[in-house]
């Protein structure tokens, strides 16, 4: 119980302070090594000022992906162009970018706008231009038109970013996803807040405010529900809340620990930690029927379950080897195997969506950092150099990890690419933020 007590004490301690309307994103490393891309301001074809700048959203998304570095608009060879027909390949020979995003916006009825965008392969366009005149179809990677409302500009900007990212990398973009996290404001009577925001911290919404700690939010596979732990009734209980109807369902309220919920891949069950039978063990509970099945049975602490993408196995943190390490249990046979061996502690693991890697917290020489292990080669890479890292959550496309850390004595969120090259902080303006969870594709 000694290690679990420390974990629980740390979780309660870190669940304490406030947040502002949105999280900032401060990029700290990795932009210089990113792939150059050109994003032109979308040409406004109406009167007065344009409603919103879609290109700004696209540029910010591509920078935050850690993969691309948009070039300074002032250094681009053409200005005020919005279609591939206006593109002059010869003018771009010295730019050095691999692609160009450009588009137009024009009024299309009451509170409606027609947004058009083109994605141009600059490398191919320049190569073709050396051979003579070329048509736009030879270097156009994508071209789309969509009618949106004034309220949808930012959302559609994320959609364009998703398209661009997938066309250039072959990996689905995750710019239309959301994150959940916990903040606390000790100046209020009900200081603990469960929050949801767009992946970039914009459109922050408070789902729940409580006078007692809230922790461990996690998303359902369809993105409609959050499971979390609440102490609002003076004890640990697990709830599932529908984000659209706001209906809350109490799933687990056994004596002792009710913690660390994780949705099964089909969304019908939760893997949880319960101590109702003595030591903390891993259980699976059916959300609808509340039927439970015990998965582990050991005198040591078993906690922090997480599912393999195929739903056939769980990984979990256990002290059964003397120190916290990550183990795997096959649900059909109950066979348990140890997964981590490097470092002093390894805990809080989750499997990447492709099933090839595991992301977790590694302690080496007393330092807690986020690490990734290739499940086939067992090669481990420490991804971060921040302090007291915890609660890693992987983006649904497997390219980024959001996690909790400490910066200038405060709890903040941070992000790191799964190759360790790109790093950013997401500090709140008023207080501390922790327990992040990245949504599935929405």
From Swiss-Prot:
<dbReference type="InterPro" id="IPR011659">
    <property type="entry name" value="PD40"/>
</dbReference>
<keyword id="KW-0574">Periplasm</keyword>
<keyword id="KW-0131">Cell cycle</keyword>
<dbReference type="Pfam" id="PF04052">
    <property type="entry name" value="TolB_N"/>
</dbReference>
<dbReference type="InterPro" id="IPR014167">
    <property type="entry name" value="Tol-Pal_TolB"/>
</dbReference>
<dbReference type="GO" id="GO:0051301">
    <property type="term" value="P:cell division"/>
</dbReference>
<dbReference type="GO" id="GO:0017038">
    <property type="term" value="P:protein import"/>
</dbReference>
<comment type="similarity">
    <text>Belongs to the TolB family.</text>
</comment>
<dbReference type="GO" id="GO:0042597">
    <property type="term" value="C:periplasmic space"/>
</dbReference>
<dbReference type="InterPro" id="IPR011042">
    <property type="entry name" value="6-blade_b-propeller_TolB-like"/>
</dbReference>
<comment type="function">
    <text>Part of the Tol-Pal system, which plays a role in outer membrane invagination during cell division and is important for maintaining outer membrane integrity.</text>
</comment>
<dbReference type="InterPro" id="IPR007195">
    <property type="entry name" value="TolB_N"/>
</dbReference>
<feature type="signal peptide">
    <location>
        <begin position="1"/>
        <end position="21"/>
    </location>
</feature>
<dbReference type="Pfam" id="PF07676">
    <property type="entry name" value="PD40"/>
</dbReference>
<protein>
    <recommendedName>
        <fullName>Tol-Pal system protein TolB</fullName>
    </recommendedName>
</protein>
<comment type="subunit">
    <text>The Tol-Pal system is composed of five core proteins: the inner membrane proteins TolA, TolQ and TolR, the periplasmic protein TolB and the outer membrane protein Pal. They form a network linking the inner and outer membranes and the peptidoglycan layer.</text>
</comment>
<keyword id="KW-0132">Cell division</keyword>
<keyword id="KW-0732">Signal</keyword>
């Amino acid at each position: 119980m000694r290690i679990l007590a420390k974990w629980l004490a740390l979780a309660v301690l870190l669940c304490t302070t406030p947040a502002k309307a949105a999280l900032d994103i401060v990029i700290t490393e990795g932009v210089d090594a990113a792939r150059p891309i050109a994003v032109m301001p979308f040409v406004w074809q109406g009167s007065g000022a344009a409603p919103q700048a879609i290109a700004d959203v696209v540029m910010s998304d591509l920078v935050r992906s850690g993969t691309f570095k948009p070039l300074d608009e002032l250094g681009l060879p053409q200005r005020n162009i919005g279609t591939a027909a206006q593109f002059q390949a010869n003018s771009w020979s010295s730019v050095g970018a691999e692609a160009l995003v450009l588009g137009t916006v024009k009024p299309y009825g009451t509170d409606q706008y027609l947004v058009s965008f083109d994605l141009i392969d600059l490398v191919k366009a320049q190569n073709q231009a050396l051979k003579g005149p070329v048509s736009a179809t030879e270097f156009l990677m994508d071209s789309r038109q969509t009618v949106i409302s004034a309220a949808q500009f930012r959302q559609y900007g994320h959609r364009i970013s998703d398209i661009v990212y997938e066309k250039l990398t072959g990996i689905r973009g995750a710019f239309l996803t959301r994150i959940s996290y916990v903040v606390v404001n000790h100046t209020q009577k009900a200081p603990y807040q469960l929050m949801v925001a767009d992946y970039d911290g914009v459109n922050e919404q408070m789902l729940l405010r409580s006078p007692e700690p809230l922790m461990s939010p996690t998303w359902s596979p369809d993105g409609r529900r959050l499971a979390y732990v609440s102490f609002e009734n003076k004890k640990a209980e697990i709830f599932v809340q529908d984000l659209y109807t706001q209906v809350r369902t109490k799933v687990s309220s056994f004596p002792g620990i009710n913690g660390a919920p994780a949705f099964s891949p089909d969304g019908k069950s939760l893997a949880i930690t319960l101590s109702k039978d003595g030591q903390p063990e891993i259980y699976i509970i059916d959300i609808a029927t509340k039927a439970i099945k015990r998965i582990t049975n050991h005198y040591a602490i078993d906690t922090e379950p997480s599912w393999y993408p195929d739903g056939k196995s769980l990984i979990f943190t256990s002290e059964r080897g003397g120190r916290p390490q990550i183990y795997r249990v096959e649900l059909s046979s109950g066979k348990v195997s140890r997964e981590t061996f490097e470092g002093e502690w390894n805990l809080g693991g989750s499997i990447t969506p492709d099933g090839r890697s595991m992301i977790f917290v590694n302690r080496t020489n007393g330092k807690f950092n986020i690490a990734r292990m290739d499940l086939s080669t067992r090669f481990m890479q420490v991804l971060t150099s921040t302090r007291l890292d915890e609660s890693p959550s992987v983006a649904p496309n497997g390219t980024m990890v959001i996690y909790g850390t400490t910066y200038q004595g405060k709890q903040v969120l941070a992000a790191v690419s799964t190759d360790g090259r790109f790093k950013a902080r997401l500090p709140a303006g008023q207080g501390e933020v922790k327990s992040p969870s990245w949504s599935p594709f929405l």
